[in-house]
Amino acid sequence: MSQSYINVIGAGLAGSEAAYQIAKRGIPVKLYEMRGVKSTPQHKTDNFAELVCSNSFRGDSLTNAVGLLKEEMRRLDSIIMRNGEAHRVPAGGAMAVDREGYSEAVTEEIHKHPLIEVIRDEITDIPGDAITVIATGPLTSDSLAAKIHELNGGDGFYFYDAAAPIVDKNTIDMNKVYLKSRYDKGEAAYLNCPMTKEEFMAFHEALTTAEEAPLNSFEKEKYFEGCMPIEVMAKRGIKTMLYGPMKPVGLEYPEDYKGPRDGEFKTPYAVVQLRQDNAAGSLYNIVGFQTHLKWGEQKRVFQMIPGLENAEFVRYGVMHRNSYMDSPNLLDQTFATRKNPNLFFAGQMTGVEGYVESAASGLVAGINAARRFNGESEVVFPQTTAIGALPHYITHTDSKHFQPMNVNFGIIKELEGPRIRDKKERYEAIATRALKDLEKFLNY
């Protein structure tokens, strides 16, 4: 390798983690960060790995998927986790940090590392054939975004404003739903939740009066330009929903349907459709239900949908400005691009959602960029681990319906043998297996 260093563009959570992982393997890094030269509407400081909104890294228990991911990252010597631990603040069962102390500590450690050169400058182009990790975040500057768009052949770098909730299939009451595609076109691909007129009217009332989450000031314009939230549709009138995402036409009841219906009508008054969200078929998203309701309100209102009364939401709907790639078509599980194995991406632009997930993607991308620099084969972590399941999901899910994803137990490879019915025990078993498999993988 004639190259004497690796470029890392962006010093957020993913970029800081990637730079550290590369440097700890004895490879020089040029870390570029435009803050200090050009500011963004979200950031308040020029520090690295700044937490823009919440100061929480979410749940810390191993019965929580993000808790498992954090533990795996600790075992992989994550700079983000280590400094987060050093600046924890009380937060019950969650891991929250003193955001300023934490980001200052990450910044100081990066600056002091003898193999990391920090360059405060805006990068407007992708460096040739040099090994590079791009981790410029959800609001990549327009100039670099255009170059990434070109790199993808005009495809795969999108702005998104919404994501619909995702539920665990095992928590859906299958006695109240039926499998069917509209007009029976193709194979039956949707789970349909039928509503009577009475059920729909109660649902509509709940939706129009539910409390929305506050928007950050820098999100407002994009919010109104983007996809229409389901609660906004509801406020525009009943017909907006009945001719939109809850359209019942072509979704007649099956002959053996025994649930409630309006008289002898063969078609429900309204239908909520659920679409398979992962290859394993363990997750389903609520089609067309992008939303900005508060999470508690989402649970209350969406559990009014027949079949979802006891549904477990592995991801709630979100509404904010973001940019992300068509990772299923563009990236390998190593976070390298398929067209150019010297070019890696990390962070939210790859379709991972959340602070911890972004840092985890930087960790994997950094390790693999370093291995490529050294002429070694890249590593793919086991799908039984959280840090292996996340890149597998974003690179193997259906590209047409791909949306950013938090880590959750639904994307981790299922346990072998009979299903453990107790959820806590099941998650504990998944976590125990994950940490054992990670240890074996690292010692292989």
Curated annotation (Swiss-Prot):
What Gene Ontology cellular component terms go with this record?
A: cytosol
> Organism's domain of life?
Bacteria
Gene3D superfamilies the record matches: FAD/NAD(P)-binding domain (3.50.50.60)
Query: Per the UniProt entry, what are the Gene Ontology biological process annotations, in alphabetical order?
Result: tRNA methylation; tRNA wobble uridine modification
Q: Is NADP given among the entry's keywords?
A: yes
Q: Which reaction does it catalyse?
A: uridine(54) in tRNA + (6R)-5,10-methylene-5,6,7,8-tetrahydrofolate + NADH + H(+) = 5-methyluridine(54) in tRNA + (6S)-5,6,7,8-tetrahydrofolate + NAD(+); uridine(54) in tRNA + (6R)-5,10-methylene-5,6,7,8-tetrahydrofolate + NADPH + H(+) = 5-methyluridine(54) in tRNA + (6S)-5,6,7,8-tetrahydrofolate + NADP(+)
Keyword Transmembrane helix annotated:
no
- Any idea what job this protein has? Catalyzes the folate-dependent formation of 5-methyl-uridine at position 54 (M-5-U54) in all tRNAs.
Name the chain's protein. Answer: Methylenetetrahydrofolate--tRNA-(uracil-5-)-methyltransferase TrmFO
Organism field: Streptococcus agalactiae serotype III (strain NEM316)
Q: Which gene encodes it?
A: trmFO
